[in-house]
Amino acid sequence: MAEKPKLHYSNARGSMESIRWLLAAAGVELEEKFLESAEDLDKLRNDGSLLFQQVPMVEIDGMKLVQTRAILNYIASKYNLYGKDMKERALIDMYTEGIVDLTEMILLLLICQPEERDAKTALVKEKIKNRYFPAFEKVLKSHRQDYLVGNKLSWADIHLVELFYYVEELDSSLISSFPLLKALKTRISNLPTVKKFLQPGSQRKPPMDEKSLEEARKIFRF
């Protein structure tokens, strides 16, 4: 029996959460080795496990993979979630890059200065409503299929639905004007593997609060 992928990161969302989502959607059981201190991170660095001295790191198929995009590409390819040809992979890459851009904007709200938060949150909401969600609604409307690419579940669908849940935490009304996106969210969320991941007690991580942010600051020294 193949060993479970082992994920090295803190017990928080961060850069690892998309990897957790993708493995869960693929129905892959995983093991997590949490960093609990800066010394834990130093140990990984000192034993040569981190090529570029940073996490996330995933042990899978005899490799110690770092760099989030490389890890996601490998998992998507391994579990047939990365399209059937170069054109489909190009579309998946294009969509996921847009998703990453917006996800990073949302995550950065957590660490911005308190006096800037309201203005920056309003700007992010404006971009969600007027740039990103209309773009993905347009994609689905253009081909009237159940999934973003090739009428088949791909990494892009999973990544987008993960984003929907982050946006919902920010403002649950933002998706209301986009019926095809709402339908996609429901469709993906009801897949047995994803539905299981969305249940309490799974390896999905909760939103970051002040306590978990402080823990991250100590581990990653920022």
Swiss-Prot record:
Record domain GST C-terminal: where: 85-208
InterPro entries: Glutathione-S-Trfase_C-like (IPR010987), Glutathione-S-Trfase_C_sf (IPR036282), Glutathione_S-Trfase_N (IPR004045), GST_alpha (IPR003080), GST_C (IPR004046), GST_superfamily (IPR050213), Thioredoxin-like_sf (IPR036249)
Highest taxon, organism lineage: Eukaryota
GO cellular component: cytosol; extracellular exosome
Record domain GST N-terminal: where: 3-83
Sequence similarity: Belongs to the GST superfamily. Alpha family.
Name this polypeptide is given: Glutathione S-transferase A5
Annotated source species: Homo sapiens (Human)
Gene name as annotated: GSTA5
